[in-house]
């Protein structure tokens, strides 16, 4: 195999397999490696590509040296020593989003942020459909982007993570946004500023930047070519909240669009998501009637502050997607404001090096007991033990049982871990499903 044209795919999960399929269809020579002995897609891969070199259980420096280009799966860090060495030598290191961007010509709406990106991506996709457009919603949500190139839709709505943006260079979007920033993935970034810089890449070749007026530190120093469209709860913004006839309403440049009571989800973070989706939809020229219709009907996404059931006048919420401090803080604040009683929080898992101290004030205000699970339970306990009652559980079943014992009528039991799930579960969906099944069995 000629190394002049060899591409090496690093990582063989869903993304890596989609890259292999894409390159094979283009007759591009490639090889694959994964540091895991049994990566998720290896059996599929060897059945489909028995003659393609696959290295498992380690990374091969020899093979990386032979590569003209390296495609890095988002789960593999650019700081991985052998990868960092290749980058230092000037080797082209890209991800699947870059491969996608090189091969599509349809308009793209691109969305990132620490919290809310899956919800906003989903809502903008629904707005497109309501306007009669053929849309593909993909990226860090749903199917890999390379599987969405054919047949080509009218529009792409992409959810993008910081890891995906780090290895993307050719993305041109009609509109792009960073919804918000809070500490996440600090096991992959030296500082919050490094994490923000990765996110800011989304604006690089964007026609209409969409910005959060409540977090100007994200965007104020960026050299935009066009005036941004803004959204915000607390500051003057194009899409904002306004008082009208003694009701809080969503407004666009001062014009009242709808009272927030018409929304099924109207806690603060839901309103921020709605305002961001309206700004993105406006940039994509979606009629306002279609957008408002979608917002009125939208009732949320599984594992994102999802109501599970009421049992003995206690409400149970599954926010397993709350994998970072910012998401859990937002969930506590919004449910705490709405609760008749207090919150019992189930939290813990793999903290990813995060600082848990931003949870202190909302826990003090709304949470009467925290049930801790998982690897970084001791770190959470150290942060919160002076503020509220702390209990530990060895399993989700035990956590639900303890939280139910601690709750009384009017209280809310909230699973919002502020941590990744991989120490105890396959992923955050699995964690949320186990919580939901346990609650439904009460």
From Swiss-Prot:
Its EC number is 6.3.2.9. Pathway: Cell wall biogenesis; peptidoglycan biosynthesis. It comes from the Bacteria. Its main location: cytoplasm. GO terms for molecular function: ATP binding; UDP-N-acetylmuramoylalanine-D-glutamate ligase activity. ATP binds at residues 113-119. It catalyses: UDP-N-acetyl-alpha-D-muramoyl-L-alanine + D-glutamate + ATP = UDP-N-acetyl-alpha-D-muramoyl-L-alanyl-D-glutamate + ADP + phosphate + H(+). Keywords: ATP-binding, Cell cycle, Cell division, Cell shape, Cell wall biogenesis/degradation, Cytoplasm, Ligase, Nucleotide-binding, Peptidoglycan synthesis. The keyword Iron does not apply. InterPro entries: Mur-like_cat_sf (IPR036565), Mur_ligase_C (IPR004101), Mur_ligase_C_dom_sf (IPR036615), Mur_ligase_cen (IPR013221), MurD (IPR005762). The keyword Nucleotidyltransferase does not apply. Pfam families: Mur_ligase_C, Mur_ligase_M, MurD-like_N. It is found in: Cytoplasm. GO terms for biological process: cell division; cell wall organization; peptidoglycan biosynthetic process; regulation of cell shape. One of its GO terms (cellular component) is cytoplasm. It is an enzyme of class 6 (ligase). PANTHER family: UDP-N-ACETYLMURAMOYLALANINE--D-GLUTAMATE LIGASE (PTHR43692:SF1). Cell wall formation. Catalyzes the addition of glutamate to the nucleotide precursor UDP-N-acetylmuramoyl-L-alanine (UMA). Belongs to the MurCDEF family. This is UDP-N-acetylmuramoylalanine--D-glutamate ligase. It comes from Coxiella burnetii (strain RSA 493 / Nine Mile phase I).
């Amino acid at each position: 195999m000629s190394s002049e044209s060899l591409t090496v795919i690093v990582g063989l999960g869903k993304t890596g397999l989609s890259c292999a399929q894409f390159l094979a269809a283009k007759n591009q020579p490639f090889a694959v490696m994964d540091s895991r002995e049994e990566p998720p897609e290896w059996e599929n891969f060897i059945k489909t590509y028995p003659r393609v070199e696959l290295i498992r259980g380690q990374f091969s420096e020899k093979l990386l040296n032979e590569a003209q280009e390296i495609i890095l799966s988002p789960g593999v860090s650019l700081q991985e020593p052998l990868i960092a060495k290749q980058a230092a030598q000037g080797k082209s290191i890209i991800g699947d989003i870059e491969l996608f961007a090189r091969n599509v010509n349809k308009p793209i709406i691109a969305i990132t942020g620490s919290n809310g990106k899956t919800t906003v991506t989903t809502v903008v996709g629904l707005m497109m459909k309501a306007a009669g457009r053929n849309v593909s919603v993909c990226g860090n949500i749903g199917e890999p982007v390379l599987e969405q190139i054919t047949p080509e839709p009218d529009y792409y709505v992409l959810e993008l993570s910081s890891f995906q943006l780090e290895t993307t260079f050719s993305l041109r979007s009609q509109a792009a946004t960073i919804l918000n920033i809070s500490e996440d993935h600090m096991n992959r970034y030296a500082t919050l500023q490094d994490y923000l810089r990765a996110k800011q890449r989304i604006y690089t070749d964007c026609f209409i930047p969409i910005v959060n007026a409540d977090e100007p530190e994200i965007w104020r120093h960026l050299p935009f070519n066009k005036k941004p469209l803004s959204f915000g709860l607390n500051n003057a913004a194009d899409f904002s909240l306004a008082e009208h006839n003694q009701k809080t309403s969503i407004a666009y440049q001062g014009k009242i669009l709808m009272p927030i009571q018409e929304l099924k989800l109207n806690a603060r973070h839901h309103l921020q998501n709605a305002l961001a989706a309206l700004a993105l939809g406006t940039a994509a020229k979606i009629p306002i009637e279609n957008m408002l219709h979608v917002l009125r009907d939208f009732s949320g996404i599984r594992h994102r502050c999802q109501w599970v059931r009421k049992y003995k006048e206690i409400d149970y919420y599954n926010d397993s997607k709350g994998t970072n401090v910012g998401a859990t803080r937002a969930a506590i604040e919004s449910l705490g404001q709405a609760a008749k009683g207090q919150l019992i929080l189930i939290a813990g898992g793999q903290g990813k090096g995060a600082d848990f101290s931003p949870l202190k004030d909302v826990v003090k205000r709304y949470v009467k007991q925290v049930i801790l699970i998982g690897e970084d339970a001791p770190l959470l306990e150290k942060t919160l033990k002076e503020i509220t009652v702390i209990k530990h559980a060895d399993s989700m079943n035990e956590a639900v049982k303890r939280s139910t014992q601690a709750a009384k009528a009017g209280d809310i039991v909230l699973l919002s871990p502020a941590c990744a799930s991989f120490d105890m579960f396959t992923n955050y969906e699995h964690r949320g499903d186990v919580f939901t099944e346990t609650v439904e069995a009460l």
